Every structure is written in C-alpha cells, then in structure tokens.
C-alpha cells in the first residue's frame, strides 16, 4: 500500500499543527496515508494522517495504533519508552500526543525527543526518520515515498501562511 512522507522542515508547533490540520482537511477517503515530519528546537514533531478506512474503528484505539511504531523506534535506539495513553520515559511524559478526526482522516500527532536522555547528544533526524519509517511500514504494511504537497494541498497550505509585512 503506497503512503506519503512529507517533510515540512523547521516549524514552530503552531505552524506544524496548522499545516497538519490543513493537509488532513483536504484528503479524500481514498487518499494514501501521510506521515508529516517536522523539526523544532528540541523535538521532531510528526503527525500520521490516515483516511478512516485505515484506522481502527474506535477512536479510543487510534493513539496506540498511531504511536506503537514511535515507541518501537525509541526502543530500537535503546531508549526504554513506553505507551500509557502517552509516550513516557522513566515515568515522564516525553511527547505531546493528540488524536483528532479532521475531515475524512484520523490524525495522530506526537513528537520524538531530539536528544535522547541517556546519550545527551542530538539524534540525527535522518537516522531517526529512517528507523521510524521502517517501523511504520512493518506495522501497517505501507510503503512510503518521500512526497511534496500536491497542488491543492500546497494552495491550502499557502492560504494559512501569514502574509509578509
């Protein structure tokens, strides 16, 4: 099953969330799932945007469905993160995860720490992205292609940007 991986680059959380909302709102029922990846000062925010046909039937299952691969990725890097309604490490909430229904899509947003506590060095985005991508592909049976927003998506995203002063 084809899926899309869209890198938004360096954005503040507000802009990242607004972009994900916009992307989700313009997806059809038959759209391919999308993983949106961003970069912030201390985190790598991400959002899984999936038409409802891919998500579990009950909304209360979406979080674990959407974040299991993130927890597996942390563990691949020997970080003992776990999922308990949120991603935790040593009893501390380390992500700001949300679940939403936007248009025809389930949207599960969260983030990875940029610096893993045991190592206290920045984890390269590329290595983390690749590990996460492989975990998502294995879990869901998807095959990601790097993607740019489509024409309609780009127009919608541009409409959300503040005008230059």
Where are the regions a protein language model picked out?
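N-terminal lobe of the biotin/lipoate ligase/transferase fold
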Residues: 1-64, 68, 158
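Short, structured patches in soluble enzyme cores that scaffold and shape functional sites
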Residues: 48-52, 70, 98, 110-116, ...
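A contiguous catalytic/ligand-binding core that recognizes phosphate-bearing ligands
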Residues: 52-91
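A contiguous pocket-lining binding segment that forms or flanks enzyme active sites
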Residues: 75, 79-122
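Short aromatic/hydrophobic-glycine micro-motifs
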Residues: 31-32, 79, 141-142
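C-terminal accessory segment of soluble enzyme catalytic cores
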Residues: 88, 107-109, 113-165
């Amino acid at each position: 099953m084809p899926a899309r991986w869209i890198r938004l680059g360096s954005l503040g959380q507000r802009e990242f969330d607004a972009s994900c909302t916009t992307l989700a709102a313009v997806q059809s029922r038959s759209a391919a799932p999308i993983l949106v990846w961003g970069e912030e000062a201390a985190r790598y925010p991400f959002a899984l945007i999936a038409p409802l046909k891919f998500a579990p039937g009950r909304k209360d299952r979406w979080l674990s469905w959407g974040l299991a691969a993130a927890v597996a990725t942390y563990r691949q890097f020997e970080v003992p993160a776990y999922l308990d309604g949120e991603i935790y490490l040593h009893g501390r909430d380390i992500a700001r995860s949300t679940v939403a229904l936007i248009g025809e899509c389930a949207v599960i947003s969260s983030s990875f720490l940029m610096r893993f506590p045991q190592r206290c060095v920045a984890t390269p985005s590329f290595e983390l992205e690749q590990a996460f991508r492989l975990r998502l592909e294995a879990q869901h049976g998807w095959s990601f292609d790097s993607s740019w927003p489509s024409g309609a998506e780009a127009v919608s995203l541009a409409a959300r940007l503040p005008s230059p002063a």
